[in-house]
Amino acid sequence: MSYHNGSIWPHDTTIVALGMRRYGLIEPFLTLTTALFEAVRHFPGYRMPELFCGFARRSGHGPTRYPVACEPQAWSAGVVFHLITGVLGLLPAAAENRLTLDRPLLPAWLKWLELHDLRLGKSRVALRAAQGREGAAIELLARDGDVEIVVRR
């Protein structure tokens, strides 16, 4: 058990995952995304800690907690939101009043995902992403304002 040697830092792991997504390394991105979502289920209140131990997985057990990790940790609390941004490829452009979803996809275990009251400038939207043949199918559920929604495949 070590603070810097072999521990998992969710914030840093997410930065790596998003870099993989950006450069088209989809399978490694999804592997890290899935691992982080699986890990967070085991922490009280779904609060992602600052770090946890990088020991091998054991069937039926969650990650080994690092005894003095900050929990919750501000930068780790943002991990889930960053990963959602990554899977949907959210690229907000408030100055242009446009929200682009760049190659949206969902991990195999996530059949659908809804975002409500997503704000862009003075506009608000609600979206639903569902498993599709070529990435995630996007449905606009609600729009308040004149924000343009662009889905790039």
Regions found by a protein language model. Give the residues of each.
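C-terminal capping/lid segments that line or modulate ligand- or cofactor-binding pockets
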Residues: 2-110, 114, 118-126, 130-132
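Short, well-ordered beta-strand segments enriched in hydrophobic/aromatic residues
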Residues: 125, 135-143
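Surface-exposed beta-strand/loop patches in extracellular or lumenal glycoproteins
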Residues: 99-104, 115, 142-153
